[in-house]
Amino acid sequence: MKKSKKFLCLLLALVMAGSLLLLPAAAANTQQSGAERYPTVYVHGLMGWGARDQIYAVTPYWGLTSDLMPYLTGKGYESYAASVGPLSSAWDRACELYAQLTGTTVDYGAAHAAEYGHARYGVTYDKPLFEGWSADKKINLVGHSFGGATIRLFLDILADGSAEEQAAAKAAGTEVSPFFQGGKADWVYSLTTLAAPHNGTTFLECCGDMTQFAAEASTAMAKLLGISDFKGVYDFQLEQFGFYRKDGETVLEALDRVLHSDFLSHNDNVFRDLTIDRALALNDDIEIQPNVYYFSSAGDKTRPSALTGKRTSAADLTPLFVPLAHHTCRFSNPTTPDGFQL
């Protein structure tokens, strides 16, 4: 209970901090903060889920034992839990977030779809996450873990658009998504990240076999759930890669098709974007928006060893993560595959 209260206090403090700094001291008690004036949209990380997934009603990602969204809304902070692809790349997730906020069909972009060999369009959201998103009704963005990379790229595209996607749509004779047209930086008030791997993670480098197993196992789960009646329970949202049951297709036909598809080879997924080299490439493309307030809260559950002085897992770390932290702390390769010096 104490940990839950501590986390909630931190979350509220981060979301509100930027807007509170804007208010004169004398007016602090009479004016609303940005978190009170504008809705806050929460974006989950790797293998996470949002309110659109049925599992959220049983085990909410934001809160786990109880849903933080209605609690925060009841306190005057309008809050929503977005659902984006648990294994999808930052680009694909950003496109899904835009479609979810606007109640439209996901458009991954003609150029992007052609480059990575998947369909241009994905799922259709029948209604927006909430009504009225605009420059007059901005949003506060909160991203946990890989959700941090997602919302940073989302804001960058929202603000600057994509000249490549505009050109590709024009060449194809199709309409470009408003998302890729840019000019909407003023639709976001603040951006907050929680334990986000902004520069990638060495875990993928030091635990290659474990990472490969996790990638293959989660991909197999995505394929099986994607064609089953349980898709809505936990939706991987990989329609662009064909992970769904087509009209008139039997379960066995769909199973044979998806099992022979290779999602990981497309390099358009979370496992690639979490590498240090790819994360740095994303960072090079992402610009800071001058009128948006940014906050980042890091986490560290390692401590210096009393015997060696080197970092090791903290005594109060969740047992499941102890071996992972141990391997990560032992990583010593000073150079990434693309030659970046750590």
Where are these regions (language model features)?
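Bacterial N-terminal signal peptides that target proteins for export
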Residues: 2-11
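Hydrophobic core
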Residues: 12-16, 20
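Intrinsically disordered, low-complexity regions enriched in polar/acidic and amide residues
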Residues: 13, 30-31, 340
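Sec-dependent signal peptide cleavage junction
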Residues: 20-33
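N-terminal non-catalytic accessory region
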Residues: 31-196, 200-215
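Helical cap/lid subdomain of alpha/beta-hydrolase-fold lipid enzymes
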Residues: 156, 164-342
